[in-house]
Amino acid sequence: VSEIPARPAPEITGHAAPFWAAARAGRLVIQHCPACGHFQHYPRPWCVHCLHEEPEFVESGGEGTVYTFTVIRRSAVPAFAARVPYVLAFVDLDEGVRLVTNIVGCDPESVRIGQRVRARFEAIDDEHTVVLFAPVD
C-alpha cells in the first residue's frame, strides 16, 4: 500500500495569519471594512473598496453557493494525483466574497453550479488547516 504524499501547505503571511488561525480552530473568517462595510477575501492590509487600512476579521456564516467548478481527473502534483477525481470550485459565500476551494463529501459528478455548500475544515498537518466545502443536505 503506497502512502498518499503530504498535501502542500499554504504559505501563511502576516495579513493572512488570522484567517489560517481561525481555520485551525474550525472557524471561517473573512475581512470586513469598518469604514465602508465591504467584505473581502483574500486577506489584505487595506480595504480594496475604499482603501481604509486594517480591515477587521469577522466570522462568516460558512455557507455559500457554487459559482463554478471543474472535476480534476488527472494531476501532475503527486499529493493531488492520489486524490483524483476531486472538485476544484469557486464558492460565493453568503457575505459576497468568492473563495477557491474543493468540494468534498459527495460524488464529484453530483456537484452543480448554484448548489448550496457549507464550510468544512481539513487539518493537513499540525500547523495547517484548509477550508473546504461540502453540499448542504
Task: Label each residue range with its predicted role.
Residues V1-L28:
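A broadly conserved sequence feature marking short terminus-proximal activation segments
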Residues R27-I30, R44:
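Residues immediately within or flanking Cys/His clusters that coordinate Zn2+
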Residues H32-A35, W46-H52:
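Short, cysteine/histidine-rich loop/knuckle motifs that typically chelate Zn2+
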Residues G37-Q40, E53-E54, R73:
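Cys/His-rich microdomains that often coordinate metals
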Residues G64-Y67, I103:
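Conserved hydrophobic positions within beta-strands
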Residues F69-S75, E122-D126:
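Short, conserved beta-turn/loop elements at beta-strand boundaries and strand-helix junctions
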Residues R83-L99:
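Short, basic/aromatic beta-hairpin or loop at an interaction surface
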Residues G96, V100-D137:
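Well-ordered alpha/beta subsegment
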